[in-house]
């Protein structure tokens, strides 16, 4: 078991986790841009243009406003 600990310590010293480059283009890192890129409700495939709202099943997938 101590050999495994030594190996793990050596690996962490040679390649620390902070050296891993983070991908700054991921949407989770930029919530404001993610909201701008989000599909608008009027263009949502389940948006009912005649009622100007989304049916209940579509509301579960982020389409708003909902037809109640």
Curated annotation (Swiss-Prot):
Keywords in alphabetical order: Disulfide bond, Hydroxylation, Secreted, Signal, Toxin
Keyword Magnesium: no
Cellular component terms (Gene Ontology): extracellular region
Gene Ontology molecular functions: ion channel inhibitor activity; toxin activity
Propeptide residues per the UniProt entry: 20-49
Taxonomy, superkingdom: Eukaryota
PROSITE patterns: ALPHA_CONOTOXIN
Pfam families: Conotoxin (PF02950)
Cysteine-cysteine disulfides: 53-67, 54-63, 59-66
Keyword presence, Disulfide bond: yes
Subcellular location: Secreted
Modified residues (4-hydroxyproline): 65
InterPro entries, per database record: Conotoxin (IPR004214), Conotoxin_a-typ_CS (IPR018072)
Signal peptide location: 1-19
Residue ranges of coiled coil: none
Tissue-specificity statement: Expressed by the venom duct.
Domain comment (free text): The cysteine framework is III (CC-C-C-CC).
Family: Belongs to the conotoxin M superfamily.
Name of this protein: Conotoxin Mr3.4
Organism: Conus marmoreus (Marble cone)
């Amino acid at each position: 078991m101590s050999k495994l600990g030594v190996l793990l310590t050596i690996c962490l010293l040679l390649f620390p986790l902070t050296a891993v480059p983070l991908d700054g283009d991921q949407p989770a890192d930029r919530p404001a841009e993610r909201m701008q890129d989000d599909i608008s409700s009027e263009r949502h495939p389940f948006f009912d243009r005649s009622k100007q709202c989304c049916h209940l099943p579509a509301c579960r997938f982020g389409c708003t406003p909902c037809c109640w």
